[in-house]
Amino acid sequence: MAGNDVIEIEGVIKETKPNANFIVELENGARIQAGVSGKIRKNYIRILVGDRVTVEMSPYDLTKGRITYRHK
């Protein structure tokens, strides 16, 4: 899969799960499970319930995603 075959969408963290996974409610109302990207993990960026985030999703599996940015 090429690196440009991703869907980027914003959402809000609704709950936390073990191992740095989160339930994110997207702008369209859907809820997905998302993990944190490597750069967020490497730089120790804290993500809490209620934070607004940008999520990358594969067009092949719309139930999982990767958190790539936490908005201020």
Swiss-Prot record:
Domain S1-like residue range list: 1-72
Protein name (Swiss-Prot/TrEMBL): Translation initiation factor IF-1
UniProt entry tagged with the keyword Repeat: no
UniProt-listed InterPro entries: NA-bd_OB-fold (IPR012340), RNA-binding_domain_S1_IF1 (IPR006196), S1_domain (IPR003029), TIF_IF1 (IPR004368)
Lineage per the UniProt record: Bacteria, Bacillati, Bacillota, Bacilli, Lactobacillales
Family: Belongs to the IF-1 family.
Description of how the protein assembles with itself and partners: Component of the 30S ribosomal translation pre-initiation complex which assembles on the 30S ribosome in the order IF-2 and IF-3, IF-1 and N-formylmethionyl-tRNA(fMet); mRNA recruitment can occur at any time during PIC assembly.
Location within or outside the cell: Cytoplasm
Keyword RNA-binding: yes
GO MF annotations, alphabetized: ribosome binding; rRNA binding; translation initiation factor activity
Pfam families: eIF-1a
